[in-house]
Amino acid sequence: MIPKSFRSAGPLATARRILFAGMSLLCVVPAFSQKVHDAIRPLPAGAVRLDGFFENDIRNSIDHWNKGVVPYAAMVDFFRNGRSQFALGEMWGKAVRSGCMFYRYTADPELKEILSQTVKDLLSTVRPNGSISCVPPEKQPDGPGGDLWERKYVLLGLDRYYDLVEADPAVLRAMTDQADCIIEQVGEPPKVPITSLGWSPNHIESSTLLEPFMRLYNRTGEKRYLDFARYIVSTGGSEGYDIFRQAYDNVPPHEMGGPYPKAYEMMSMFEGAVEYYRVTGDEYVRRSFMNLYDNIRRNEITIVGNGGGDQPYHPAVMGEGWDHTAVEQTNPDITRMMETCVGVTWMKFCSQILRLTGDPSAVDEIEKYIYNGLLGAMKPSGDGFSYVNLFNGEKVTNYGWGTTFGSLPVTCCNLNGPMGLAYIPFVAVMESDRGPVV
């Protein structure tokens, strides 16, 4: 772990010394009925410039991953022709989401063209009921296949494109059609309950739709999207376990959700909970996500800023579940731990807490992961990230969920790692009512 004194001299310190003449020119996204305002806000696109190894790693990833080997067309074909295994439809949204965040930083015209072409390709796959899905309407919603999880990432990818690259009305229409189709299919009986849909034992992954529905509500002001978000919260977020209540009651993360305390999906759902709180001011939800943040920070995060493991509590979750990892991190029986998806989502969840509250502990957690876990998981060639990250095991591994495109292995972590890099300039320098925040 890099000492604090060394870290303060790195690329983030360079960003701290930058003055931004255009800080007041913030891009404003409509926020209807907003009850809670953030203590800290991001700067406009292009306002931050890094140097040193952060800049090198970001450019390396853009050149060799987002503009390099990512098989965008093949990922779109999952929506056109179907998928061979569950959840493969997540890949397109993840690849596009990180590309859009990189574009926010670089304004790279070549990257913009790549993103524009693949978005156009995706929109050509819209099904007659308005969905962009890997399965035909008569098989929707496909629970075991991860249909809602896939459609969530379609929404997030399109949302980032619309917000950061091009505000194309066709993209907004695709998002509203996608969301409206979900509302028609999922909900209280006679619709299909959201907590009955998914591949996992408790189906928590489907409730991560909370975030894109809140984003779409903030963009459109359409009450039906807020109503659907409220429905998700009312279900507790998983089958058989009220994750919001467990977080509110300070249940340890590795005991939440029964046999499946899946770290990545749990934090992804609570990212949506923060967005929900901003609009509703629901203090029950706020206490839930603040308790979860504090309990993860104290009980799950290792010396390199990531968490989760397979031993001793949840070997069936393959190292991707909470494991009381802060204590168990040196357990010699661990064979899989610290999934890159977990670390990047922890970083994003921390950025939500930072913006909402201004709590400096969130910065400490973000820095710890960036300097250690994130950069340590990146392939030197820039074309991917390690799946799991043992302290004393293989440096880079692709063993886990994913598929192969020709000779290229693509995993969820290959796709999430670049998002972590793209968040570095996003969080490095922001602003508050009192001025720059570094």
What are these regions (language model features)?
Residues R17-V28:
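Bacterial N-terminal signal peptides
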Residues V29-S33:
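Sec/Tat signal peptide C-region and signal peptidase I cleavage site
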Residues Q34-V438:
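Glycan-recognition and catalytic cores of secretory/periplasmic carbohydrate-active enzymes
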Residues I2-L19:
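Bacterial N-terminal signal peptides that target proteins for export
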